[in-house]
Amino acid sequence: MQLQINVASHPLIQHWSGILENNNNPGTILRTACSELGKWITYEIMREWLVTETVSIKDNTTISLISNHYKYIIVIIMPYGFILAEGARALLPTANIALVSYNNSIDNISDKLDSFTKILVLDLFLDEIIMTSVLEELIKKGAILNNIKIACLECGSSQLNKLGQKWSTLEIYTTKVNSITDNSEATKEQVLKDKFFA
C-alpha cells in the first residue's frame, strides 16, 4: 500500500471525533459532529489544495484570491456522505455537487473533466468497492487522479490495502484508520447509521 493517508489531527477534529465515539449520544448530536468533521476535514484538504492567484488592485496593491481557472466538484456517496457534505459546503459554497446513487453511478457530473477540475469525494465510512467504481468513472470522464481527494470518517487498513493496489497515489483524509475490521466495528458503523436516520 503506497496510499497517502492523512489522519487529521486538528484539535476540533479530535474533539468531534471523540463525540462520535460515544454511541450513547443522541442522533442529533452525532449528526452535528459529522457535519463539523466534514467541515474541518475539508479545511485540512483545502489548505494545501486551493489554487490562488495574485491580483493587482488600485495603488499598486496586490492581493491573493482563489483562482477562477479551477472548478471544484464535491462528489457525495449517498446517503451517508451527505452528512459530511453539510459542513464541506460551508468551505466550498461554489462547488458543483454530484451524487453517487445506489448503483454506484455518478449523477450531475460532466462527461468532460480535465486537469483544471478538482474533486472531493465524501463518504462516512470508506467502502473500497464503491470507491473503486467512483474513481474508475471519474477517470473515464477525464479526471486526474492527483486532483481527487477522498474524505471519510473512518476506514479499515484492509480496505486501504485493496485501494492501494490499484490507486497507489490516491490521497485519503480521515479521522481514524482501523487496523482490524471485525464484527464490532461493523456494529459500531451500523449504530451510527441507524441513529442518523432514526
UniProtKB/Swiss-Prot annotation:
GO cellular component: chloroplast
InterPro entries assigned: PRibTrfase_dom (IPR000836), PRTase-like (IPR029057)
Subcellular localization: Plastid, Chloroplast
UniProt key word Lipid metabolism: no
Gene3D superfamilies found in the cross-reference section: 3.40.50.2020
Sorted UniProt keywords: Chloroplast, Plastid
Coiled-coil parts of chain: none
Protein name: Uracil phosphoribosyltransferase homolog
Native species: Porphyra purpurea
